[in-house]
């Protein structure tokens, strides 16, 4: 039986423009939440982390946000846990998709066609 952890709508890099002085605190809370998801996946010894859309709030997150996510996904990979990431409405698959510009550890679904892949511990596998 497959043991998985599902997460979505994390929105790393959200601006929180209307939050005024509290915007930075909210942005940090998103990073902390993602780190807790990774830690939970490891402590619960899941086999797969499924991120079902909107890991990022846009296709243009900061370098620091991308670096943070890469570090967290690498931590997951080092624990032998696969990550499967589906782009969402905020970080959608377009020509300039963050998932096409950066190499993330895990499997990125970048093709709307039915795909069957064996997930192995390796850098991101493209579905096309």
Residue ranges and their predicted role:
Residues 1-68:
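N-terminal active-site segment of His-dependent metallophosphoesterases
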Residues 48, 59-128:
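His/Asp/Glu-rich metal-coordinating catalytic cores
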């Amino acid at each position: 039986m497959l043991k998985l952890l599902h997460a979505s709508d994390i929105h790393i890099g959200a601006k929180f423009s209307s939050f005024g002085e509290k915007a930075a605190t909210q942005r940090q809370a998103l990073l902390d939440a993602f780190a807790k998801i990774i830690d939970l996946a490891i402590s619960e010894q899941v086999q797969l982390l499924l991120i079902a859309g909107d890991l990022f709030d846009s296709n243009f997150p900061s370098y620091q946000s991308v670096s943070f996510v890469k570090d967290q996904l690498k931590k997951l990979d080092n624990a032998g846990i696969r990550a499967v990431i589906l782009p969402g409405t905020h970080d959608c698959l377009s020509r300039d998709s963050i998932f096409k510009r950066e190499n993330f550890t895990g499997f990125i679904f970048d093709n709307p066609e039915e795909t069957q892949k064996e997930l192995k511990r390796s850098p991101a596998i493209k579905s096309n």
